[in-house]
A protein has these predicted regions:
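An anionic, glycine-rich sequence signature occurring as long contiguous blocks
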Residues: 2-18, 248-389, 393-395, 451, ...
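Short amphipathic alpha-helical "interface-anchor" segments enriched in bulky aromatics
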Residues: 85, 90, 274, 281, ...
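Acidic, metal-coordinating catalytic cores used for nucleic-acid/nucleotide bond scission
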Residues: 225-233, 254-258
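Dynamic "connector" segments at or just before major functional cores
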Residues: 1-174, 180-200, 206-221, 242-243, ...
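Conserved nucleotidyltransferase catalytic core and NTase-mimicking acidic/glycine-rich helix/loop elements
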Residues: 7, 428-451
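A short acidic (Asp/Glu
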Residues: 160-161, 233-240, 260-264
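Short, solvent-exposed helix-loop connector elements
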Residues: 52-59, 372-380, 396-412, 427-439, ...
Length: 487
């Protein structure tokens, strides 16, 4: 009977064992062994010595570099708040990877951030910029001295009014409104300006651009700026047109009365744009998902709150014209897109079967004259990457939580987060240059890997499990890291 029973057992049957908890007295194990790649990158960059230049402490028990590195490690392992550094501190194997580093307690990390002033925050920003210069040289070669940068802002909500300089934003959200500048092709952050919530979208944008364009000029002959309608301003356009700057720009246009007259002019010819013949299906899908539909989605969300629904009824059409903005006193090229949509009210019974059709318009102003309308649209449509970068910086990296009560402490935390963000970009650039993934996927593939950490006289050995079949991958990445950094 027993044999017959075993023979007929379901193929889905599992014999889940009984469990017992023990702690090893000799072997160090971590679930974040992939951080040895980050540790090697940090070692080769001489990052520890550079952060000592901050000179925040007079009497040092724990140096500035250790505090900053603790916050970086916390973000790489998935910590959302300073409090989570206690789990980094509890991981002895992880500390061994970073040279028996002494991890400060969470409240000590908080105290460290609160020591930052305007001067030390600027110093931290400059140190991170110097680290980035080496990778700007590499990007210059990779992209043939041409680069596209993307400027945007984002609102961070806080609760209560205990955080210094927090205020009501244009979205009626109480908090902060930082300005972010990305490298469009790679997602690398060039700069962050931390601002009160009440700051206008473009506040500080010209100063940010001036500081960063001067950094890029030695490495890139062509610089293109992409920006949203919040940066449709005379000061920004004039900056781009300055004789000593001369960069190209594509900025989302406002739709005011003079622009409407141009859009509705009888002579205006609207055509369906030609699609690139060399695009793969995946590229088309990715491009279309970020085309001006993200603007259309904003309209859809807004109307849904009023009980309306929007449906697309027509093909995408494009047109262009030259227009002189009165305040700018100069003529520029405007490129616009439109799509026929239908609006229907689902709440009001009297209008349930009534629908109105109209065109939804979205356009840009540019000083680029040597590219076709399709090329301009293709480039600006990909600006949706910036929205995804900001979302991943907030949610993936974990900057959504504002850690301290002090304004410059929070600014410093955002700069340290920028360092974490860029370390990921720099690491991938070396070991998998074609790979662009979000933080959740990055941690899963590269960081969250269990291994024994064994310290010997000459090495710290990363010993993966017997059945772990990705040892060759990690060996390949480590070799690439060593070769690139030694080159």
């Amino acid at each position: 009977m027993k044999k017959s029973h075993n023979k007929n057992r379901s193929k889905n049957h599992l014999d889940i064992p009984n469990f017992k908890i023990e702690q090893s007295k000799k072997i160090e194990i971590t679930a974040n062994s992939g951080l040895f790649l980050v540790a090697e990158l940090i070692k080769k960059m001489d990052m520890i010595e550079k952060f000592a230049e901050l000179d925040i402490f007079v009497r040092k028990t724990i140096g500035e570099a250790i505090h900053i590195l603790t916050l970086v490690i916390n973000q790489f392992t998935g910590g959302d708040a300073i409090y989570d550094t206690k789990y980094v501190k509890a991981d002895g194997a992880l500390q061994t990877i970073f040279g028996d580093m002494h991890i400060p307690a969470p409240h000590t990390s908080g105290d460290f951030l609160e020591r930052f002033t305007e001067q030390t925050t600027d110093k931290l920003r400059n140190i991170i910029w110097k680290m980035q210069d080496n990778y700007l040289k590499k990007l210059s070669k990779r992209f043939n001295r041409k680069i596209t940068i993307s400027l945007d802002s984002s609102v961070y909500e806080v609760y209560g009014n205990c955080k210094e300089n927090s205020s009501q934003s244009y979205k009626n959200i109480f908090g902060f409104h930082p300005l972010l500048l990305h490298i469009h092709q790679t997602g690398e952050l060039l700069d962050i300006i931390f601002r009160p919530g009440a700051a206008f979208t473009s506040t500080g944008a010209v100063n940010m651009l001036e500081a960063n364009i001067s950094r890029l000029k030695p490495y890139f002959d062509e610089i293109i700026l992409l920006a949203d309608a919040g940066f449709y301003e005379k000061a920004i356009v004039q900056f781009c047109e300055r004789d000593d700057i001369k960069i190209k720009f594509i900025i989302t246009s406002e739709i005011n009365n003079p622009i409407r007259q141009q859009l509705f002019a009888p002579e205006r010819i609207w055509i369906e744009p030609d699609q690139p013949t060399d695009e793969k299906d995946a590229q088309v899908k990715h491009r279309d998902s970020h085309s001006f539909n993200y603007r259309l989605q904003a309209l859809t969300d807004q109307l849904r709150k009023k009980g309306n629904v929007v449906k697309i009824r027509g093909a995408l059409e494009v047109a262009e014209f030259d227009h002189t903005v009165a305040a700018w006193k100069k003529t520029f090229r405007f490129v616009f897109k439109r799509q026929l949509i239908m609006k229907q009210n689902l709440v009001d019974q009297s209008e349930l079967f009534e629908a109105t059709e109209e065109y939804f318009y979205h356009g840009y102003v540019t000083n680029i004259d040597d590219q076709s309308i399709e090329q301009i649209i293709s480039l600006i449509d990909s600006r949706g990457h910036q929205e995804n970068f900001i979302k991943d910086f907030k949610r993936g990296l974990g900057t959504v939580h504002i850690p301290t009560k002090h304004f410059y402490g929070n600014y410093a935390y955002f700069l340290i987060s920028m360092l974490s963000w860029n370390l990921k970009c720099w690491l991938l650039y070396i070991i998998e240059p074609e790979l662009q993934i979000y933080w959740k996927r990055f941690r899963y593939l590269f960081i969250k890997v269990g291994a024994q950490i064994i310290k010997t006289g000459r090495y710290v050995i990363i010993r993966f499990g017997k059945n772990f079949d990705r040892v060759a991958e990690f060996s390949k990445w480590f070799e690439r890291l060593l070769q690139s950094l030694d080159a």
